[in-house]
Amino acid sequence: MNLGQDYNAIFSKIRDFEANAIGQIGEEFLKSVLNAIDEVINDGIIHDEYDIMTKSGVSFEVKTAQKGRTNNTFQFNGINPRYNYDFLICLGVREDKLLYRIFKKDEINYIHKERKYFMKQNEFKKQLVPMNPDNQVNYKLTLNIKELEEITNLIKELERVLGLD
């Protein structure tokens, strides 16, 4: 617990939550946003390959992380490049605001020569790093605050990716 610390910022209580709880919060948040613009058709059903499916047939994998304690980065864990989803949404929670970035599934590229996965989006390129040396299934992606968008743009971008704009 962070006793004696300031809890005045809008999301400050999140610092006391475990990673799984933060992930569930992010998923529920995205479901509520998607329900406002499209319909989530399998709310509450656990899937192996995606977290959310909309009525329009678009699937989302949601990863939520809080800002690191000593630097301005977020580590999004448990990304499986082989899973079957249309979009990966990374939600970054700071104590004072929410940030995000949306990636198309086909922006995850395996570079055989380097034997590594990369997230490539226009000029942006970041390596997906194995969660641990023996795990070649789940990866992590570290993003800087500057590589994420303000949450105020999320609905417009979701409408665009869903073809509703």
Residue spans for each PLM region:
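Nucleic-acid endonuclease domains
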Residues: 1-55, 63-165
